[in-house]
Amino acid sequence: LKPKDLEEIPFSLLIKDCSVSFMNHKRTCVQLAVDIAKTMVANFGKEIKVDMDIMISGAILIDVGKLLEYEIVDGKLGTSDYGKIVRHPFSGVAIAARFGLPPGVQHIIGTHSKEGDLGKRTVESIIVHHADFVSFEPFKA
């Protein structure tokens, strides 16, 4: 995939005829996460702590593994051979670790999708998980 592809490819292959781009979904997810976190801090004050830097970084990068999971062949977007056996939360964590990103960011990347349902999520990961699904699930309805 090339940078320009991200404004054109659908954000998910799980939604038939999805016309929402990868980058549009990404911007929406980040904005939702920030809005949720700010609202929670405004209403709950000291009762909740959100590391905004970690949360925003994680929200931006949750789908970085899709750059390995997806490929364009003959002008058509599909799942790469790699992506057929390694989903984007796993490859995304590997990319983040390779570049020395903090464990909190890696955690958000690894737990933002269904793979995170079996373990513990940090506050930041919970917020990003829900922001991601709010900007995903309605397109499956």
Regions found by a protein language model. Give the residues of each.
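Divalent-cation-assisted or electrostatically stabilized phosphate/pyrophosphate-binding catalytic cores
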Residues: 76-98, 126
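Histidine/acidic-rich helix-loop-helix segments that form or flank divalent-metal centers
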Residues: 44-46, 50, 55-56, 93-97, ...
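Short, surface-exposed linear patches
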Residues: 39, 81-83, 130-133
